[in-house]
């Protein structure tokens, strides 16, 4: 046991160990045998279905999705650290897969915390129903790039997209590149 292990909860250690076996038994053998797929630019040629299905089987694809929708909730006070521990372990096998799962987790938290019940039902339903469904989000602007990490009102932020509340909803004006 390392010093780092002593700061993890028992659940985090268990989840990390499950992910470690997943990487050793599934991800690394696939990468070793199919390293040339890294250069296949077609979506269907990259990550085989069974990898996401296996990530679903060990319970990491739907982390952060409320249990009432069929997901796996985490203790709020440990959620971010749990995501970090698991993503680090997955990235040991394939950083691209880790990034895909991190996007699921980030968007799940945003939906859970900010979306209407209707949107939660719609999008969590899609994620739970289809083991190959992945969430994504778009954050950059022509002048903003990584400014998304700054506070929304930071004077040095170059993000131009604005949202304005109007009768019946919101109007969002901005530009993606």
Model region roles, listed by residue range:
Residues 1-102, 119-129:
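Amphipathic, small/basic residue-rich leader segments at the start of a protein or domain
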Residues 48-52, 104-114, 135-137:
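Short N-terminal helix-initiation segments at or just after the protein's N-terminus
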């Amino acid at each position: 046991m390392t010093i780092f292990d002593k700061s993890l909860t028992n659940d985090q250690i268990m989840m990390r160990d499950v992910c470690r076996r997943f990487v050793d038994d599934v991800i690394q053998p696939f990468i070793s045998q199919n390293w040339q797929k890294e250069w296949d630019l077609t979506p269907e040629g990259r990550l085989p279905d069974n990898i996401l299905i296996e990530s679903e089987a060990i319970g990491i694809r739907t982390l952060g999705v409320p249990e009432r929708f069929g997901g796996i909730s985490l203790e709020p006070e440990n959620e971010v650290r749990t995501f970090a521990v698991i993503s680090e372990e997955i990235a040991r096998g394939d950083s691209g897969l880790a990034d895909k799962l991190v996007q699921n987790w980030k968007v799940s938290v945003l939906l859970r915390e900010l979306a209407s019940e209707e949107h939660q039902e719609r999008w969590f339903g899609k994620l739970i129903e289809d083991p190959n469904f992945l969430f994504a989000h778009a954050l950059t602007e022509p002048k903003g790039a990584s400014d998304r990490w700054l506070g929304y009102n930071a004077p040095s932020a170059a993000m131009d997209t604005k949202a304005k509340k109007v009768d019946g909803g919101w109007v969002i004006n901005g530009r993606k590149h």
